[in-house]
């Protein structure tokens, strides 16, 4: 790893710099007004001034900042729940996101410009962050079981497949997916599951000693949950048309998330012994409402519909963690470390189906058939792309860690000589997590 990883990382960054030099320019007022025709009235575009375009940039920049925080802080800390994998969870999240946003900019820009030079503005910045979200979701499915080189390769391959599917959904199918329940969440989850299935190892089937949390690691992960929960309305509304569409996307997401929290807490207490809450459910299922409502967030659905979607998503997510994750691991040989299928996969599919129902009720001008095609395309391309990527990552040259060193920072990081985990531990009765003895 000492030479392979630095060489590949530096080579890729040099390639990014060259590609940006060849194809990317600043966005000017003239090309910005053409590019954002869908966001402005045509009669106003001819009079768009430089100051007006700057105003538009800075109007959208707060939404971009919110999405940026979700990508780097929210996803990063959500990955820190493993007791010996906190450095890798938040550290590799930063690395993959930084690489992914550059590659996502290139791939999406070239596809939408048909291979020609394109201009880089605020919408490109937001969409670049969106493209990295797919990788970070998939990263959760293989967390602790892959080397940095494998993660790097997966980022490059997955974003290429994602960009192709996103172009197909938005340009050819002309489907509505403002909050990206289908193109980001469902796609990222099933891509990651496909990779995890190919990389499955029987040695990790039984409980690995490092595949668990401790009190403080769950607390750090909860910080990620809170950042994601707070900023999710910005994620679902960032690329919505300004005005009523953006307003509806914010409000519907806000209420869907609130309703989701209530049902997630209720179901967590219901399915656990003695009615106690499971921190895994609270960290993840409370976010499912934001995932599920994403596709129809900007549609003219009533608030009670958004709340219903969020409530059902919370139930689906908790039940998935309790019953479906063990089934995936034991029967289908797919070990999903973070449970991305329950947070992103199932709620993402549910969100796509909800959008079809909303369209059938006349709440959007999109086509039901194209919406269904978009959902099928997102899942199908994710599974096929994930299987092929998994086969590439399975090659022995990529330094995949052996079973005994999985979920351990010391494989890739310099860790402090003294760690809390070096002290004695005890386990409370009827408690699944190891806790530090005081």
From Swiss-Prot:
Membrane side Extracellular: which residues?
A: 26-61, 108-121, 170-178, 240-249, 297-300, 364-372
**Which BP terms does GO give this entry?**
ammonium transmembrane transport; carbon dioxide transmembrane transport; carbon dioxide transport; erythrocyte development; inorganic cation transmembrane transport; intracellular monoatomic ion homeostasis; methylammonium transmembrane transport; multicellular organismal-level iron ion homeostasis
Q: Which residues are glycosylated?
A: 31, 36, 41, 47
Q: How is it modified after translation?
A: Glycosylated.
Superkingdom per UniProt: Eukaryota
Cellular component terms, GO, for this chain's entry?
A: ankyrin-1 complex; membrane; plasma membrane
Q: Which residues lie on this side of the membrane: Cytoplasmic?
A: 1-4, 83-86, 143-148, 200-218, 271-278, 322-342, 394-438
Give TM regions. 5-25, 62-82, 87-107, 122-142, 149-169, 179-199, 219-239, 250-270, 279-296, 301-321, 343-363, 373-393
Name the SUPFAM superfamilies for this protein: Ammonium transporter
**Gene3D superfamilies in the record:** Ammonium transporter AmtB like domains (1.10.3430.10)
Q: Which is an annotated Pfam family here?
A: Ammonium_transp
Keyword terms, alphabetized: Ammonia transport, Glycoprotein, Membrane, Transmembrane, Transmembrane helix, Transport
According to Swiss-Prot or TrEMBL, what is its membrane topology?
A: Multi-pass membrane protein
Q: Which residues form a coiled coil?
A: none
Compartments in which it is found: Membrane
Q: Null phenotype?
A: Homozygous knockout mice lacking Rhag exhibit normal growth, development and fertility. Mice exhibit no significant change in body weight and body mass index.
The molecular function terms in GO held by this entry are: ammonium channel activity; ankyrin binding; carbon dioxide transmembrane transporter activity; leak channel activity; methylammonium transmembrane transporter activity
Catalyzes what?
Answer: methylamine(out) = methylamine(in); NH4(+)(in) = NH4(+)(out); CO2(out) = CO2(in)
Range of residues in the leader sequence:
none
| Presence of keyword Membrane | yes
Q: What is its main location?
A: membrane
Subunit structure and binding partners: Homodimer. Heterotrimer; a RHCE monomer interacts with a RHAG homodimer. Component of the ankyrin-1 complex in the erythrocyte, composed of ANK1, RHCE, RHAG, SLC4A1, EPB42, GYPA, GYPB and AQP1. Interacts with GYPB (via the N-terminal); this interaction bridges the (RHAG)2(RHCE) heterotrimer with the SLC4A1 Band 3 I dimer complexed with GYPA.
Q: What does this protein do?
A: Component of the ankyrin-1 complex, a multiprotein complex involved in the stability and shape of the erythrocyte membrane. Heterotrimer with RHCE (RHAG)2(RHCE), that transports ammonium and its related derivative methylammonium, in both neutral and ionic forms, across the erythrocyte membrane. The transport of NH4(+) is electrogenic and masks the NH3 transport. Also, may act as a CO2 channel. Moreover in erythrocyte, regulates RHD membrane expression and is associated with rhesus blood group antigen expression.
- Which protein is depicted? Ammonium transporter Rh type A
Q: What is the lineage of its organism?
A: Eukaryota, Metazoa, Chordata, Craniata, Vertebrata
Q: Which gene encodes it?
A: Rhag
């Amino acid at each position: 790893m000492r030479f392979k990883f630095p060489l590949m990382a530096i080579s890729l960054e040099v390639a990014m710099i060259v590609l940006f030099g060849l194809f990317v320019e600043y966005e000017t007022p003239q090309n910005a007004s053409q590019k954002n025709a869908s966001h402005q009235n045509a009669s106003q575009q001819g009079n768009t001034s430089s100051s007006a375009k700057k105003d538009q940039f800075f109007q959208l920049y707060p939404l971009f900042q919110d999405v940026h925080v979700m990508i780097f802080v929210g996803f990063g800390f959500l990955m820190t729940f493993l007791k010996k994998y906190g450095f890798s969870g938040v550290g590799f999240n930063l690395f993959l996101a930084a690489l992914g946003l550059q590659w996502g900019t290139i791939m999406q820009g070239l596809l939408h410009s048909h291979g020609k030079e394109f201009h880089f503005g605020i919408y490109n910045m937001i969409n670049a962050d969106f493209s990295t979200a797919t990788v970070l979701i998939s990263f959760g499915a293989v967390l602790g079981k892959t080397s940095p080189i494998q993660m790097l390769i997966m980022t490059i391959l997955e974003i290429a497949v994602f960009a192709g599917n996103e172009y197909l959904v938005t340009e050819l199918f002309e489907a509505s997916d403002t909050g990206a329940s289908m193109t980001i969440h469902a796609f990222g989850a099933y891509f990651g599951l496909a990779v995890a299935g190919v990389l499955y190892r029987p040695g990790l089937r039984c409980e690995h000693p490092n595949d668990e949390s401790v009190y403080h690691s769950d607390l750090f992960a909860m910080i990620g949950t809170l950042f994601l929960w707070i900023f999710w309305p910005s994620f679902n509304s960032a690329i919505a048309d300004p005005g009523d569409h953006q307003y509806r996307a914010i409000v519907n997401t806000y209420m869907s998330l609130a309703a989701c929290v209530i049902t997630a807490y209720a179901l967590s207490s219901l399915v656990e012994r003695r009615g106690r809450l499971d921190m895994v459910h609270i960290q993840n299922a409370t976010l499912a409402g934001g995932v599920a409502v994403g596709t129809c967030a900007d549609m003219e659905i009533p608030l009670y519909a958004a709340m219903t979607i969020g409530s059902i998503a919370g139930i689906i997510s908790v039940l998935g963690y309790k019953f479906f994750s063990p089934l995936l691991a034991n029967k289908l040989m797919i070990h999903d470390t973070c449970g991305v299928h329950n947070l992103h996969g199932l709620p993402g599919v549910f969100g796509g189906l909800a959008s079809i129902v909303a369209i059938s009720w006349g709440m959007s001008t999109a086509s039901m058939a194209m919406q269904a095609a978009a959902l099928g395309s997102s899942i199908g391309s994710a599974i096929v792309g994930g299987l092929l990527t998994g086969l590439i990552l399975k090659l022995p040259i990529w330094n995949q860690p052996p079973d005994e060193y999985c979920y351990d920072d010391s494989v890739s990081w310099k860790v402090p000589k003294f760690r809390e985990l070096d002290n004695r531990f005890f386990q409370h009765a009827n408690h699944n997590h190891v806790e530090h003895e005081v």
